[in-house]
Regions:
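Catalytic-core signal marking the mid-to-C-terminal active-site face
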Residues: 2-4, 15-28, 36, 41-48, ...
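N-terminal small/glycine-rich loop or linker at the start of catalytic domains
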Residues: 4, 21-22, 30, 93-114, ...
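Short acidic (Asp/Glu) and glycine-rich catalytic loops that position anionic groups and cofactors
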Residues: 4-9, 50-57, 205, 243-244, ...
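Short beta-alpha connecting loops at secondary-structure transitions
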Residues: 10-14, 292-297, 325-332, 360-371
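Flexible, glycine/charged-enriched surface loops at secondary-structure junctions
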Residues: 39-46, 59-60, 140, 200-203, ...
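Glycine-rich, N-terminal phosphate-binding loop and its surrounding beta-alpha-beta segment
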Residues: 44-115
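Helix-rich catalytic cores of soluble enzyme domains
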Residues: 120-349, 353
Length: 481
């Protein structure tokens, strides 16, 4: 366990917002909740909120949240907890000292590198990407990356989760749970993998996502499903996704305060329903193109919105996740890589704990295998930068500098041999001299990424589930109708 989670440890985060900025945003969110409220389309959620002191009017789905109710309910959410892997080796402590990276999910198309066109995703894409994610050292969490079009609409989520469980040992994130039955089926599957429901509830093997409907609305069926997850101690990624200027204020602080209000409302629901259930303050806010109103994922404004949400999660002491790889690029390449690098660096700088989005640009709709590998390379570089470096007697190497002296070489020194393994070794970037690069085919990063994908798929063998467990998962899938 220690070796895996240590690679994601980072230095203390910085801040774009001052403490007074954060207080103003928080106070604005509380005012929104108390005076405007949230439209809660779940009768179960409204009942739980009413019992906790929220203002629920008979015959209305709008709920208002007095400040003291919000404070009381948010205080019930745990400040730290661990996301479990299939085995404890891949456990991920959420304690504010790590930055983890997860694949994106629910892509509705796949980029074909040969034809430069799109195709429909299938279940095999989930198997392949789960296997690749299992192999890649900086992928911490796997989320089924596409919607499997070759599976029945009713059960494609369950099919995808089974394939994910069979092809990676890492923590799993369920993004697309659409109803309570899907949640129960996935919980049953997780319990089979871990050997029982109590172990499943204790380990937090699966976390689930609940997206708000900005501005200030919650879908009833999805909220009911999240309540089932919460009952079973599955961490809920509360994901608010306002588009500044369309479904949120165009000013960044305005959109952050509104998404903060939405997030607080969901924390209140889950803590009223299942006190002490683990919450993750998620956020994937974006900006708009002022000329067309279209989505601009990966813009500086989108990046700052994500950073602001991370800071507000830290303000209330809740673990966070955010969309650090949310490029709006329509294909793999320079735009996707540049936008993702800037966003990922920014999210890590402010203490992003779970950074979402590897491999699925164009507003989290397009799976591209080569961009998946490029994004992974970016994640590794970001982690290396924010891990920092030690300042110790050995690291300062003053005695060695005296020994080598002026004009000497450090290459053959034992100190160099011992410490050079700490240098970041890229999987895809080229560092050969020009002539050697040409001799090897003058391949660009995209070509090398595709070659690496083929190599991983041919050679990596994930640790399989016991045959009896796979059979039980298959039975659950067949019974899901």
């Amino acid at each position: 366990m220690a070796e895996f989670e240590q690679r994601f440890r980072i230095r203390a985060p910085t801040s774009f917002l001052s403490s007074s900025d954060r207080k103003m945003i928080h106070d604005a969110a509380l005012e929104i909740l108390e005076t405007v409220g949230v439209r809660v389309h779940s009768a179960n959620a409204r009942k739980a909120l009413k019992g906790a002191g929220a203002l629920v009017t008979e015959g209305s789905v709008d709920v208002k949240f007095p400040k003291h109710v919000v404070k009381s309910l948010v205080a019930k959410a745990p400040k730290t907890f661990t996301l479990g892997g299939r085995t404890k080796e891949f456990d991920l402590p959420l304690d504010g000292t790590h930055s983890y990276y997860t694949t994106d999910g629910c892509g509705i198309a796949v980029w074909d590198a040969k034809t430069k066109s799109r195709r429909k995703p299938v279940l095999e894409d989930i198997r392949k990407t789960a296997l690749i994610g299992d192999y890649l050292p900086y992928v911490s969490i796997y989320e089924p990356m596409v919607v499997a079009n070759d599976m029945p609409e009713r059960s494609h989520v369950i099919h995808g989760m089974k394939v994910a469980m069979e092809n990676t040992q890492k923590h799993l994130l369920s993004e697309s749970t659409t109803n309570s039955d899907e949640a129960r089926a996935q919980i049953q599957m997780g319990a089979e993998v871990l050997g029982g429901i109590e172990e499943f509830r204790k380990r937090h093997y699966i976390s689930a996502m609940l997206c708000t409907m900005s501005p200030l609305m919650l879908d009833g069926i999805a909220t009911d499903a999240a309540m089932v997850w919460a009952e079973n101690h599955c961490p809920i990624h509360i994901t608010s996704m306002p588009q500044a200027g369309i479904s949120g204020p165009v000013t960044l602080s305005g959109s952050v305060s509104m998404l903060h209000a939405e997030t607080l409302s969901v924390i209140c629901i889950m803590q009223a329903h299942a006190p002490g259930s683990p919450m993750i303050y998620g956020s994937v806010p974006t900006s708009m193109d002022p000329k067309t109103g279209s989505y601009m994922g990966g813009s500086p404004e989108s990046t700052l919105l994500c950073a602001g949400a991370v800071e507000m999660a830290r303000h209330i002491g809740i673990p966070n996740s955010t969309g650090g790889f949310g490029s709006g690029a329509k294909a793999p390449g320079i735009q996707a890589s540049l936008e993702n690098a800037v966003s990922a660096m920014t999210c890590a700088a402010v203490g992003g704990e779970v950074v979402n989005g590897l491999g699925v640009p164009d507003g989290s709709t397009l799976l591209t295998y080569e961009q998946f590998l490029i994004d992974h390379e970016i994640a590794g570089m970001v982690l290396k930068v924010f891990k920092g470096y030690p300042v110790t007697k050995d690291a300062l190497a003053t005695d060695l500098v005296k020994k080598v002296g002026i004009g000497g070489s450090y290459l053959a020194q034992m100190h160099t041999i011992k410490n050079m393994r700490e240098i970041f070794m890229p999987m895809l970037w080229d560092s050969d001299p020009f002539d050697m690069w040409v001799k090897k085919g003058a391949k660009d990063p995209m070509a090398r990424a595709l070659e690496k994908v083929d190599e991983i798929l041919k050679t990596h063998k994930p640790v399989p589930l016991d045959k009896s467990v796979s059979e039980k998962l298959g039975t659950i899938v067949k019974q899901f109708k």
